[in-house]
Amino acid sequence: YQFLFDLFLYQFSNLDLVELQRCIGLDDGNLNLLFGCDEMLMAAQSLGIDGAVGSTYNYLSPLYYRMLAAFEKGDLCEAQSLQRQSVDLVGLLNLVSPLSASKSLLKRIGFDFGPVRLPLRSLTPSEQKAFDESIDHLNLFQ
């Protein structure tokens, strides 16, 4: 039955990197562990995660690809700079509703999946305007 255990992927979505290290070490390091906090991907990568699952990868994957490539090349300054951009974006998402803001961003880049489901609500026009201005200021979507 070991082959069944090998098929499982485990998602770790906690900001506690000490606990992440403990999980990485479980089963002699043989777990397939995915990290679920986009704004801390580089830190988790340095600890040895196997991959990542996150919402901002849907619309900001080029940034994360560049960040991981820089990290693998040993260009920590570039990787850190790109990770800070992710941190800034996640911070903006958390100022409003992360899911509503993510839907807004997806629509902005051409993927309109409709409004969020109840009990969530879409951004109000004033929230949308402020959010768009903040996103423009980050200069992530050119």
Describe each region flagged by the PLM:
Residues 5, 31, 110-113:
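Homeobox/homeodomain signature
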